[in-house]
Amino acid sequence: MIGKTITNFSPLTEGILLKRYKRFLADVELDTGEVVTAHCANTGPMKGVLHVGGRVRLRHSPSPSRKLSWSWEQAQVPSGQSFSWVGVNTALPNKLVRLAIEAGCLKQELGEIFEIKNEVTYGVARKSRIDLLLTPHFNNSDSRKIFVEIKNTTWAKGSTAVFPDTVTTRGQKHLQEMINEVPSSRAVLVPCISRNDIEVFVPGDSADAKYGDLFRLALNAGVEVIPCAFDFHLDCITWEGTKPFLKGENF
């Protein structure tokens, strides 16, 4: 299924990133010469992805209910002797992973799925939300519910994808909650690798040492890790398969 189209959309508009500011805003000079302000859904540091003067792709969605009609969707980054397009819209990973499951791309890893629910409340205090809750088909040998936590992964060191790119107390909490779900349920961490130049995934110990420690603790407790890669094009996003992972940057 490598190369399978997961979602299609109207062709994006290309331009040059002039600046990103106030976390949510980015000024872009379109190839027509027009300068526009786009919404940036990614409020993090965007390590290794934010390149002033680099090429970007925007979605144009004019609407009276929107303050900004442009949204920053993709960024072009150096990759070896070439370039790679990276998805920077943090609202997409959950949708992409769900679509990949529905398309059967993860049948080998997850089995046949009967039902998928989004944003389900769970956890010891019932104050957390799992990205996806899967109910296996009755034919599956493993009938346990599957809790799926998805992490948008854009930072890369060479051909290695790394998450997180900064300290994430929220991510730490999610790992702790997932540990509590096994073995009565399956808990699966899915790094959603939003670029096509990756060979392996590692937790970002250099950015968040505690997250790295919890990642390894979760592995030992039975939490599964399934890194999923996608390729971002001008008018579609395709499935690039699952990737192997290492236990840490120094392992």
Curated annotation (Swiss-Prot):
InterPro entries xref list: SfsA, SfsA_C, SfsA_N
Organism of derivation: Prochlorococcus marinus (strain SARG / CCMP1375 / SS120)
Coiled coil (residue ranges): none
Name recorded for this polypeptide: Sugar fermentation stimulation protein homolog
Gene responsible for this protein: sfsA
GO MF assignments: DNA binding
Residues annotated as transmembrane: none
NCBIfam families assigned to the protein according to its UniProt record, in alphabetical order: sfsA
The family this protein is said to belong to: Belongs to the SfsA family.
Domain of life: Bacteria
HAMAP family documented for this protein: SfsA (MF_00095)
